[in-house]
Amino acid sequence: NEMRLPAFVGRLNHKFANGSMLSGRSFVAEKKTSQDEEWAWGVGIGGKYQLTPKTFLKADYNHIKGDGRFLMWTNSSYVIDDQKHIQSNEFDSISTGITHQFNTQFRSTLGYGYMKAKDNNAFARINKDNTAQNKELWQGWINGMYNPYKPITLGMEYVYGERETFDGRTGTDNRINMMASYDF
């Protein structure tokens, strides 16, 4: 890895009077090795719709080529082929969820996320037997977040998901997460 330039990121937000929001995002990033270089890029659009003062829907769509560091659920950004050339991962992802603030201390989110990698390119062919790289992946989750007092947040989340690798192997993710955070 011989990258010297940072990622160039652009974002445009539009907020509505009722608390809803639309967002457009893009980035370009250098990918460079001693033998090859390429530009990674991505575009995304998302929104938040305020259903009630305490409930909102959120959705995002992204298309990325060559860099997955800005999103969860992604594969490696690229792989190096036999000729030492960069072969980029390319994928689409969506996520959606609904969040409700029950009172000043407790909120909950029900969400869903999906990622589908392009499976007819060199990245997929090279990673055909790699069990760490996903052709498709989805997850659903429900959580509860409790703020006993500011700045402490305690949370619990149930996650279920399924994945498929480029060679057709499948797996499941079925877990409970617990967290505690302190906002400085």
Please place each PLM-identified region on the residue numbering.
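Detector for outer-membrane/organellar transmembrane beta-barrel domains
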Residues: 3-5, 11-134, 138
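A generic structural signal for well-ordered alpha-helical surface patches
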Residues: 139-142, 178
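Conserved active-site loop/cleft motifs that coordinate metal ions or position small ligands
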Residues: 108-111, 143-159
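Outer-membrane beta-barrel "beta-signal"
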Residues: 146-148, 152, 171-184
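Short, surface-exposed beta-strand/loop micro-motifs that present aromatic residues
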Residues: 10-11, 143
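Short proline/glycine-enriched turn/loop segments at secondary-structure junctions
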Residues: 165-169
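A short, acidic, flexible beta-alpha connecting loop/helix-capping segment that sits on the rim
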Residues: 29-32, 158-164
